[in-house]
Amino acid sequence: MTSIETTVVKVGIADLKIIQFPQLIRTSGLGSCVGTVIYDDKKEIAGLSHVLLPYSQQGKQANTNPYKYADTAISYLYNELLKRGANQSSLKAKLAGGAQMFQLRTGSDLMRIGPRNVESVELALAEFGIPIVSKDVGGNLGRTIEFDPRSKLLAVRKINQEVIMI
């Protein structure tokens, strides 16, 4: 019997990557940021996006990193997965993050970055018809996540808590 050696591909803030088994994919530093995994339920291919902000407001800044924003990163992730052989009808999503890291005394919606990131990711996924299978969002704790494209499990590690599998 041959053992399969897995490697972990790390995704930074405002970044995204695509993997195939035997690779795993991980991102850390998810406070108000949202980690979105889109995967093909029938193949062993997946992508992970680590978004920082909800909307790109394109046109205000030249040369903006599209992976930084939920509205543009999800589109890039979706299209890249299709280019790599994923089947649109088999795509599913899991997400984590979107915490409210600081107590705010203002009622301003602009400062609710975590919840706004989650809403923007959910809207972008809905636009592409990608169902969200599971999520671990909100609260006030940072997260690290790791996805296995073979088992389709997302390990979510919160600070000072046990790992949960979603």
UniProtKB/Swiss-Prot annotation:
Transmembrane segments: none annotated. Gene3D superfamilies: 3.30.1330.200. One of its GO terms (biological process) is chemotaxis. The keyword Hydrolase applies. One of its GO terms (molecular function) is protein-glutamine glutaminase activity. It is an enzyme of class 3 (hydrolase). Keywords: Chemotaxis, Hydrolase. Its EC number is 3.5.1.44. It catalyses: L-glutaminyl-[protein] + H2O = L-glutamyl-[protein] + NH4(+). Belongs to the CheD family. Probably deamidates glutamine residues to glutamate on methyl-accepting chemotaxis receptors (MCPs), playing an important role in chemotaxis. This is Probable chemoreceptor glutamine deamidase CheD.
